[in-house]
Amino acid sequence: MAIGNPEVATMGKENTEAESSNGNESQLSSDLTKSLDLAEVKEDEKDNNQEEEDGLKAEASTKKKKKKSKSKKKKSSLQQTDPPSIPVLELFPSGDFPQGEIQQYNDDNLWRTTSEEKREMERLQKPIYNSLRQAAEVHRQVRKYMRSILKPGMLMIDLCETLENTVRKLISENGLQAGIAFPTGCSLNNVAAHWTPNSGDKTVLQYDDVMKLDFGTHIDGHIVDSAFTVAFNPMFDPLLAASRDATYTGIKEAGVDVRLCDVGAAVQEVMESYEVEINGKVYQVKSIRNLNGHSIGRYQIHAEKSVPNVRGGEQTKMEEGELYAIETFGSTGKGYVREDLECSHYMKNYDVGHVPLRLPRAKQLLATINKNFSTLAFCRRYLDRLGETKYLMALKNLCDSGIIEPCPPVCDVKGSYISQFEHTILLRPTCKEIISKGDDY
């Protein structure tokens, strides 16, 4: 049996111990590496999970926002139908209606724009202003629709009934609280105003007609009166431009403390600067001297003051808070109108007191008029619509008694043509507002 060298054995033992220690160290380092790797993997997984959660939350919040924005869009996307059928109140649920065009007073009244007292007065009058603006918004939407459907060949009575029924829908007609302020005027050619077809009328709108479409709306008796002229033949364009320009001149001149005669002088100067050629003959456009603009009262279309369309009128001044219809008429005829044709417009006398009536039928008709129109103008078609029959004798009796005032059509000479434009303006303490102004005129 061989015996080994002790030094060699010692060295081998040392080597074995060194190898084992090295092995342990490498084992520890590999274990540490694995644990670090596992920690990193877990951290990555945690980060990924967090990112996924954040993504899901963001996606959910985006969906909610989209839903909210969609619901908001749905709420605010209510628009007028074609033909118009949605009441204007539903289109403006806040109850605030669009302002008309604002014009500042001339420099001599500039102090009004800085007066706190004047602005406070405006705030107190806001409910009245809002009623006027609501009536004006109905007027704008109705005339926009009517312009889109007007064409030669239409029966005038169909035209009027379409317009009036649209007004009734959009204004949410409610007796004397909201509705039509006066009958639709659709006067043709040499007829300047106050013509609307009676029941059974077969008049047809022609290509060469010049039609004045004049209608009014009201909320609680606060009336908006506005008119424009329609002509399909471009030959009449200068005639329309004359009255349109003259109307805006009158509006520009109007204001607090302005004399009515000064407005008339400015209107005439502009109107009579125009000429129109019709079928080879040139006519100077004349301002009709016996038709005027007018102040407007509550349930009173023609109040106390008249705004002339020619120079030399009244020295009376316009006053703060007043409502005016500035309307001008340009004619190729004599520039003077007379009553003619069958009467269709009627209106209860605003200042009439108690008048004893003998005819029972007249009393009954007056009760109908008081209930449905009060002192607002009406026409025979409106009485027909209410179911009144065989009323002409009773109506004549009311006219003869001075209770009802007939308003027959007014005409220039035959063969002449007349144009008209009209706006309602409000003389506010700080500025004037063209209540009925729209995109069309």
Swiss-Prot record:
Chain sites annotated for binding substrate: 194, 302
GO BP terms: N-terminal protein amino acid modification; proteolysis
Region (Disordered): 1-103
Biased composition annotated in UniProt, kind: Polar residues: 18-33
Domain of life, source organism: Eukaryota
The protein's required cofactors: Co(2+); Zn(2+); Mn(2+); Fe(2+)
InterPro entries, sorted: Creatinase/aminopeptidase-like, Met_Aminopeptidase_Type2, Pept_M24, Pept_M24_MAP, Pept_M24A_MAP2, Pept_M24A_MAP2_BS, WH-like_DNA-bd_sf, WH_DNA-bd_sf
EC assignment: 3.4.11.18
Note accompanying the cofactor annotation: Binds 2 divalent metal cations per subunit. Has a high-affinity and a low affinity metal-binding site. The true nature of the physiological cofactor is under debate. The enzyme is active with cobalt, zinc, manganese or divalent iron ions. Most likely, methionine aminopeptidases function as mononuclear Fe(2+)-metalloproteases under physiological conditions, and the catalytically relevant metal-binding site has been assigned to the histidine-containing high-affinity site.
Tissue specificity field: Ubiquitous. Preferentially expressed in roots.
Coiled-coil region: none
Role of this protein: Cotranslationally removes the N-terminal methionine from nascent proteins. The N-terminal methionine is often cleaved when the second residue in the primary sequence is small and uncharged (Met-Ala-, Cys, Gly, Pro, Ser, Thr, or Val).
Protein name from the UniProt record: Methionine aminopeptidase 2A
